[in-house]
Amino acid sequence: QQLYVCARLVSFLREVEKEDGIQPGKSVMIVPTAIGASMNEGSRLWEPENMDINRRFPGDPAGSTTERITDALLERVKNYRYGVQLTSFYQPGSFVPHVRMMDTGRQNPDLGCEFGLPYVYVRTPRDYDQTTLNYNWQLCGTQAYSLYAGKTREIDEAAADQSLRAIVRFLNSRGVIRSETAPGHASAIITNADMTSVSATSAGLLRRVKFAGA
């Protein structure tokens, strides 16, 4: 799903560029994937080390393979004013497309509302969150946002459309590109205090009666 949204964004921005829609002095860099080999194997982990690359930031130029990759990636992107990460999730499931960011003291959730998605989730980081791209990107001075695009292992066209429109809307709002965009949602800003875990009270078969966004 994330690679598909990136591919569509590249195609869209090529057309914008042909029409001189990239604003003077602005640029957009797109990194579809950091480790193509893992995608070829259908895994979100770096297989030789069985490591989640998003738990290896800020990286180490003299460290393991994943640490060298994350160090090089962060060096390339840390000087951008805004950053959008199309995030996969470590657990199976589906999401209403939304924006997340870590509470680092440097986050700006009001800017996150400019994506026009239903909600912006400001998450209180746990210790292991301090090794993620979003957390370390913010510490570098970038307004970094994680965009959850619906699914991970399969393409959801409706969620991909919504995610693409959200990114274009944000780029337009921030004066990076000039393009017509439809208005989005009036985003709600939520925190950990608004989240609830729902667990079954007994064992048995699960029949789903509610779906994300329905």
Regions found by a protein language model. Name each.
Residues 1-214:
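Structured catalytic-domain cores with a bias toward divalent-metal coordination
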